[in-house]
């Protein structure tokens, strides 16, 4: 049997795509004159929407009180758990007794920027010893690393 592709059997997404209705091309096209906007009024004009406008009702952002602030020099910490390091070792991406620092974590794709500070937390279990160079570590994480013979050095 002939398995050749016939031109009349080819269907593309382009042939199935319905073209949008053109607006404002005269009253004969069905969407002419007002182009589906109705007559007059604020929504009939160009540049229509006013963000946060609720029809004269006091808007939600003026009803709610102002709260808090954003500190200018906020420290951005990338959180690394000891369980994450264990999983990396099990996946053979790192070897035991190695140094875990910013450059290593950046190359592995664990942190987005080399400028981020690293915070070591104690989620999960660690079974091999590692040397950590981090900016912050919780007390529980320090104990967990020390219990398997590793060490944590705080950089800043």
From Swiss-Prot:
Keywords: Ribonucleoprotein, Ribosomal protein, RNA-binding, rRNA-binding. GO terms for cellular component: cytosolic large ribosomal subunit. GO terms for biological process: translation. GO terms for molecular function: rRNA binding; structural constituent of ribosome. The keyword RNA-binding applies. InterPro entries: Ribosomal_uL15 (IPR030878), Ribosomal_uL15/eL18 (IPR021131), Ribosomal_uL15/eL18_sf (IPR036227), Ribosomal_uL15_bac-type (IPR005749). It holds the Pfam family Ribosomal_L27A. It comes from the Bacteria. Residues 34-43 have a biased composition (Basic residues). Residues 25-48 are annotated as: Disordered. Binds to the 23S rRNA. NCBIfam families: rplO_bact. Belongs to the universal ribosomal protein uL15 family. Part of the 50S ribosomal subunit. This is Large ribosomal subunit protein uL15. It comes from Wolbachia sp. subsp. Drosophila simulans (strain wRi).
